[in-house]
Amino acid sequence: MVLFSLLLVLAAADADDRLSKKMLPIYVKEVETYSLTVKSAPKQALELKKEPVFEWLNPARNAQQGTIFLWLRNGRPAALACIFSAPNRRLPGRNINHELHALDVEKLVVKRDQYNQWKPQAGLARKQLSDATPPAAARGARLLQMRRLAQEFGGHSLDRDGKRWQLRLLPTPLYRYPAAKSGIVDGALFALMSSAGTDPEVLLLLEVKKVDGNLHWQYACGRFSDWELHVQRKDKEVFASIPSESNPFAHDPLHLYRLYQEKVVTLEGKLLARIRPKNPHVPWGEIVPVKDK
């Protein structure tokens, strides 16, 4: 029985790996449809990091599978995209979904020659961590500090039925900033995952900022789920995302976060249908089949 169970686990892992390899080229093409700049430098395109920083599965939500990409600005994460998919219930393919979040302190300018659009209205604000131990001088020691600081953050999500899911820290950062001598001299992008799967539900930036020769900690949290979210640090709530008229399924009030269904494709990448979201408060849209030529 133990051997049989192990074989089932290995078979499932192999199937997940095959799915990931088939979907990755499709996901890369999707993320390449975006062109990002910051408002102060509209002619300097942000660097798209085409190598995924994370891949995930969520068996509890219709066998979803996805990959996370970053756009960088001088080596710092400026925006994040998760392209993920799930089986379509009517067509022999998978729904392709786009989930995005602005990370730069400046407002992003996003250009995309497609039906679905993302228009952030501000940058992602940072908050001070004045009660934390001052950043160490050595880069290696600061990474250890960041890991310990990140462990102070936790929380929970509530699905549409009111079921509570615990949020836990992904121990390895999604991305570590390269060294710098001024401004943001160090930092890392972390994520909190739900117990429902391995997909990030909350983004957590921890940064070291140099001001007048002194190093200080700052942080930012970002919604990365359509569920209700609550994040605490040392038993005090520091971030929440509660569904409302201005904070619906598809975006947050400032459109830093954006989520939509884009299309239906086969595992070979053939387009079967386009999806046209009509209501930002619901997770589905109009499916427009593509006629074979």
Locate the predicted segments by residue:
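Polybasic, proline/glycine-rich intrinsically disordered low-complexity segments
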Residues: 14-47, 57, 81-178, 200-292
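Bacterial N-terminal signal peptides
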Residues: 1-9
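Exposed beta-strand-loop-beta-strand "reactive/processing" segments of non-cytosolic proteins
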Residues: 46-83, 173-201
